[in-house]
From Swiss-Prot:
It comes from Salmonella newport (strain SL254). Equilibrium between an active dimeric form, an inactive hexameric form and higher aggregates. Interconversion between the various forms is largely reversible and is influenced by the natural substrates and inhibitors of the enzyme. The keyword Membrane does not apply. This is ATP phosphoribosyltransferase. The gene is hisG. GO terms for molecular function: ATP binding; ATP phosphoribosyltransferase activity; magnesium ion binding.
Length: 299
């Protein structure tokens, strides 16, 4: 039985978000053994329990108050929200923040040999999908009537198998669609992973732990999106060098031993430093340019 004094977090047991969710928790300093097949794993250093479940169960667990937090794709969350509203429920939860992984898009796809002149081409057609409510909302807004074919997997084979005229499914590269004679024709929803919290009163100790976790998540994401940059640069061209690094804080400037015209620059940049940028820095006279990853970061 779950201990209600411990913070309960639901994550995907296996699948698209599983590895990234586990990595995020680990980088937040939560020591936990997630390599076993147990449904519930207890953190060693914090009062936190991790529930490993199917991704489409996570929104319901949060909305029903079974767990305190959940890491879930916005596509799954929105589908469950629409499903419950269609049944007359009023689901409650809070989205604490979007995360920096799990990006995908939900798209319409049709056979490659069929003409496409917009959603109206699907009027009266049968569409296979695992997201019937998101599909209905989109096509209702377009004034398109259709028949839904609900499939929980292998949606892309439906047209070839004669089950549907088109599909609505998650797309990453489009290779699976191409292999099944389909082409992506319209994106209806873009999604990333997000962290959600249940509605209702929360014990002060739990809320303090959630606040601490949010601060650490922010630090992890900032660290992943930032780089620590060091270089030697001509003193008279510092502003030109800084202008090439948008998003960077004002740099730390240090004198170089035996050098009057050059200084050492240290800075954190929130921008990806491409080879082209490094070549421009070098053209301005910068040298010994180092770009380093940041493990942890807190403003």
């Amino acid at each position: 039985m779950l201990d209600n004094t411990r913070l309960r977090i639901a994550i995907q047991k296996s699948g698209r978000l599983s590895d990234d969710s586990r990595e995020l928790l680990a980088r937040c300093g939560i020591k936990i053994n997630l390599h076993t097949q147990r449904l519930i794993a207890m953190a060693e250093n914090m009062p936190i329990d991790i529930l490993r479940v199917r991704d489409d169960d996570i929104p319901g667990l949060v909305m029903d108050g079974v767990v305190d937090l959940g890491i879930i794709g916005e596509n799954v969350l929105e589908e469950e929200l629409l499903n419950r509203r269609a049944q007359g429920e009023d689901p409650r939860y809070f989205t604490l923040r979007r995360l920096d992984f799990g990006g995908c898009r939900l798209s319409l796809a049709t056979p490659v040999d069929e003409a496409w002149d917009g959603p109206a081409a699907l009027d009266g057609k049968r569409i296979a999908t695992s997201y019937p409510h998101l599909l209905k909302r989109y096509l209702d807004q377009k004034g398109v009537s259709f028949k839904s074919c609900l499939l929980n997997g292998s949606v892309e084979v439906a047209p070839r198998a004669g089950l549907a005229d088109a599909i609505c499914d998650l797309v990453s590269t489009g290779a699976t669609l191409e292999a099944n004679g389909l082409r992506e024709v319209e994106v209806i929803y873009r999604s990333k992973a997000c962290l959600i919290q249940r509605d209702g009163e929360m014990a002060q100790s739990k809320q303090q732990l959630i606040d601490k976790l949010l601060t650490r998540i922010q630090g992890v994401i900032q660290a992943r999106e930032s780089k620590y940059i060091m270089m030697h640069a001509p003193s008279e061209r510092l502003e030109e060098v800084i202008a090439l690094l948008p998003g960077a804080e004002r740099p730390t400037i240090l004198p170089l031993a035996g050098e009057q015209q050059r200084v050492a620059m240290h800075m954190v940049s929130s921008e990806t430093l491409f080879w082209e940028t490094m070549e421009k820095l070098k053209a301005l006279g910068a040298s010994s340019i180092l770009v380093l990853p940041i493990e942890k970061m807190m403003e």
